[in-house]
Amino acid sequence: WTKLREIDTPTVCNAIEVAQGKRGFDAFTRGTFQASAPNDPAVVGFARTAQIAGKEPPTEAPDVIRARRMDYFRHMDAGDLPKVAVTEDLDGSEAVSAWWGEVHTTVHKGLGCVGAITSGPMRDLGDMAEGFPVIASSIGPSHAFVHVRTIGAGATVHGLTFQDGDLIHADRH
């Protein structure tokens, strides 16, 4: 894993095309990301997926939301190492709820994740867990009404659908 972290994602894409003997590899995200630590090595690991939302308050009972959140943490704790948390924000371009910040980077690092990729915003730049990069669609100040909607059912981020166990190589590209 150490060697893979030392190269950037465009190099990985090129290597895959060489190995396939043709151009046209397209298993990568589209769009522009914000990287919490753009000069850090790449994030390499196996996907652990979830979907979140937060623009509006959840309509389910608080005990249901709380139980799902605990199931989410158990899900992130499981799986092969190293792990990358991948969260799709179902609010899309209107996403305002930053799941990823100081608290969640610290918690997920403790669960064995080495980084996160999200279609939603991140926050608490400068206060995130050291060595836990987040690659997000945007930066925002609030967690709003963020809550977990699905766990382990896949997550689509910038046009690429991730499934649990997918091998990920990600950086500021």
Regions found by a protein language model. Give the residues of each.
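Intrinsically disordered, low-complexity regions enriched in acidic/Ser/Thr/Pro/Gln residues
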Residues: 1-79
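Buried hydrophobic positions in well-ordered alpha/beta secondary-structure cores of metabolic enzymes
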Residues: 16, 108, 166-168
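Extracellular/luminal Protease-associated
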Residues: 74-118
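Short coil/turn connectors at secondary-structure junctions
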Residues: 44-45, 80-83, 111-114, 129-132, ...
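General beta-strand structural signal in soluble alpha/beta enzymes
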Residues: 25-28, 86-88, 116-120, 136, ...
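Acidic, glycine-rich flexible loop/linker segments
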Residues: 137-173
